[in-house]
């Protein structure tokens, strides 16, 4: 196997000031041949502030639009860390499907290191009729 080309979906714009990383990407090719990616941005791999972002490419992934949050929902009672993937249906509806771990606070890990229990999670779905 050899690497033909390297594509960067997300780079932290302020790495000296803010710790952010992009993880768990999913990419679909839309009907107009553009690419759409959903991925998660957060402070750390297991951080409670993980949110799903969307970005598009019109040049086969060589460059990407500035990431935008998939939604603007504000969690009032308990925070959720989420990850969703795109799925293009035959009728050209675009789904974002995934899950969100319910976080009792920002410092509780997803997996309890003593009991190995996993935090509860909620299934998530979002539907787009306009290619995201």
Predicted features by range, described:
Residues 1-132:
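Asp-box/BNR beta-propeller blade signature and adjacent active/binding-site loops
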């Amino acid at each position: 196997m050899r690497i033909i080309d390297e594509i960067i979906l997300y780079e932290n714009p302020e790495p000296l000031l803010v710790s952010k990383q992009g993880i768990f990407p999913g990419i679909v090719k839309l009907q107009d041949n553009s690419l759409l990616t959903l991925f998660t941005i957060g402070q750390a791999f297991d951080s409670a502030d993980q949110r799903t972002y969307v970005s598009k490419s019109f040049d086969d992934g060589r460059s990407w639009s500035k990431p935008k949050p998939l939604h603007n929902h504000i969690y009032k009672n308990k925070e959720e860390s989420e990850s969703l993937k795109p799925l293009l249906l035959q009728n050209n509806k675009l789904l974002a499907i995934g899950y969100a771990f319910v976080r009792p606070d920002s410092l509780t890990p997803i997996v309890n290191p003593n009991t190995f229990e996993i935090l509860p999670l909620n299934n998530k779905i979002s539907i787009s009729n306009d290619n995201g």
